[in-house]
Amino acid sequence: MKFNAAHYLLPLLPALVLSTRQDYEELEKQLKEVFKERSTVLRQLTKTSRELDGIKVNLQSLKNDEQSSKTDVQKLLELGQRQREEMKSLQEALQNQLKETSEKAEKHQATINFLKTEVERKSKMIRDLQNENKSLKNKLLSGSKLCGIHAEESKKIQAQLKELRYGKKDLLFKAQQLTELEQKLAVAKNELEKAALDRESQMKAMKETVQLCLSSVFRDQPPPLSLMPSNPTQMLHPPRTVASRIPEARTKSKPQPSSPGHHDSSQVQATKEESRRPSVCGPQDEGSSCLVKHEEGPQSNSTAESELTTQKLQMPICSECEEKKGPENPSASFDGTPAREEKLL
C-alpha cells in the first residue's frame, strides 16, 4: 500500500518541486520582506529603546529634580520660617530701637535746651568779657604811656646813677686824699706842739715889748733895747717857717676839683661848723677887732692855731700900727685856707 502511494506520488514530484520551489522563493521573498520588516522593526525597537532609555533618564532626572525641588521647597519653607522668626525678632529689635531712639531724642532735646541756655549765658559772659577787654585795652594804653614815662625817668635815673658812680669814684679818690691830708696834718700838729714851747716864750717876750712900746709912747721915751732881742727876725723866724710849712703841705695835698654836689655839701658843712663857732670879744676891743674861737676837728684846730700865731707874730710892735681885724667869712671852707694865709702873709 505504501508502494502504491509512492508510485502515485512520483509523477507529482516535479510539480511539487516546482511548487515547492515557488513556494520557497515566495517564502524567501516573504522571509526577506519579513527580515526587512524585522530589521526595520529592530531598528525602530532600538530607536524606541534608546528613546525609552532617554525617557527613563529623563524620568530619573525628573524624579531627582522633583526630590531636589522638594528639598529646595522644604529648605525654602524652613528659610521662610526662619526669616519670619528673624523678621519678628527684627521688628521687636526695631521697636526697642525706636523706643531707645525716642528716649535718646528726648534726652537730646533736653540737652539741646540746656545747651541753648548755656550758650545764652556764655554769650552774655562773652559780652561782659569783651567790655572788660575794652576797658583793659584802655588801661593798657594808659599803662603803656606810663611805661614810656617811667622808661624816660629810668633813663634819667640811670644817667644820674652813672654820674653818681663817677662821683663815688671822685669821692673815694678825695677820701684817699683826705686820709693823706690827715696824716700830713698830724705831722704838722706834732711839729706845732714841738714849737708851742718856743711860741710861749716868744709871746712873753712880745708882751714885754708891747708894754715897753706903750710905756715909751706915753712917756715919750725910747724903750729899753736891752729887753728886746738883738735880732727880731730871729724871733719871728720859727713861726714863719712853721706857717710856711703848713701852706706847702696844704698845696701839695690839695684835692682835685670835685663835683658840684660834693662842693656844695662841703660848703654846707663848713657853714654849719663856722656857725657853731662862738665869737669872743673883749670889752676893750669893741671898735677894733674881735677874735673868733674855732670849734673844729683836729684838722681845723691845728690850722686855726697856726693862723692865730702867725697873725700875732706879724703884728707891728707899735700900738699905733695895730690892724683892725674884720670878721671872718662864714662861707669859707677847708679849701679856702690858702687864701687866708695869702692875706695874712
UniProtKB/Swiss-Prot annotation:
It is found in: Secreted. Residues 164-192 are annotated as: Leucine-zipper. One of its GO terms (cellular component) is extracellular region. Residues 1-19 form the signal peptide. Residues 16-211 form a coiled coil. Expression found only in the brain and spinal cord. Glycans are attached at N133, N301. Residues 261-277 have a biased composition (Basic and acidic residues). Residues 223-345 are annotated as: Disordered. Residues 298-313 have a biased composition (Polar residues). This is Leucine zipper protein 2. Its main location: secreted. Keywords: Coiled coil, Glycoprotein, Secreted, Signal. InterPro entries: Luzp2.
